[in-house]
């Protein structure tokens, strides 16, 4: 299976004066790769076949062109105020041409996987403009760090979807298939396609926001702020092979989302903190429902509190935090109509505890570690079972990464890193209140993945140029694991096998 990828990301900075700087960042990516839907579930787990097995037609590809550019201007108005203007534009054009897993035909033990043919060209454009005023001043004995900003945005998306829906599985030879246990047993057809969706969407977004971080005392800090969002979304459904006429739906909504936080330092190495935030986000322009209607915005509330501790003069830092997050209208793949369409869940809740530690143990020796216990469940819904665990969310997960750079001698600048990432078992799909509306549940096993890296860094390798060379190794033990599922038994994504990626970074100053 061959993948082609080109990625460029140039960045330029210009000090126009002692008070004004301009920064330009660009990004271009070309990607052409087979459409890999991973493996399939059998029984309560994933099929016992190699993760390298490709269950589709490798000659069918997803071809993507993506470009993004950002221009940011900073201007120091005075010693207390700074102005920022940023404009970002992005365009993505893709062609999705697949013969991919659809469903198992007959007994699962036979391994006959029906394949569906799809053609989906898509174009997405987004343009955003931000203007912000940053402040750093005092009122009496109270210090303030403030931000006031306004954001304008527009997103446009258009997509046409055609497919054969897997063909006629009741007639041998009338549908494409592959045997998951023996991929030499297969039949790839090129059937006539039916256009089942042709839609374009436009989102217009206006946001205004403010924030103030107030130092009431040297050991007492308060933050408060908020954001007001107004958006207008229009979807136009063009004629397809099921609908002969066009239709248009429009949705306008607004919300104010506050945030507040407090941090108190009873003793120098210890900080107690608590935060409350609300969120409001229009659904992306590319989201599609089976009936062509628009989705309500995603809304959320989050509570967090914990303790931070610093040791050895701040060289080692750790945090323990409790959190409780609730979100409404979270989109997921439609279990009744296929993953090209979405449905919104009523409410999902995630609560748990996080622990992390980071710092320098000895000169040149750094460590980062974290652990999280996350209980993510559906709490309110008409389709999915209330109280059921959300897919792809493990109760336990954590990571450890440590690096060492030699500080002197002929090996100065050389370094190495080693670490691990672990996840517990996860559900593959949502459970439905009525089992007839969802596929049978299954689990993805927990795993531990080992990673490593080699480094070389040198200051002033050329005039005013620093160098960082790295080789990163992922899954060095080539362990079999699964990164997630897409709410279907036939789409279980495999984790990457042993991979080595080299990089060179030059930093000009």
Question: Where would I find each of the regions flagged by the language model?
Answer:
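Transmembrane beta-barrel wall of Gram-negative outer-membrane proteins
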Residues: 1-36, 61-72, 76
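Structural signature of Gram-negative outer-membrane beta-barrels, strongest in the C-terminal barrel
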Residues: 15-17, 124, 143-155, 162, ...
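Short loop/turn motifs that connect adjacent beta-strands in outer-membrane beta-barrel proteins
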Residues: 19, 78-80, 138-145, 216-219, ...
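Surface-exposed loop/turn segments flanking beta-strands in extracellular/periplasmic regions
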Residues: 40-53, 104-113, 160-197, 237, ...
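Face-selective signature of the C-terminal outer-membrane beta-barrel domain
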Residues: 69-92, 115-236
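Membrane-embedded beta-barrel scaffold of Gram-negative outer-membrane proteins
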Residues: 74-76, 80-88, 92-100, 265, ...
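Conserved C-terminal beta-signal and adjacent last beta-strands/turns
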Residues: 122, 146, 303, 391-509
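Gram-negative outer-membrane beta-barrel transporters
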Residues: 218-219, 324-326, 344-431, 505-506
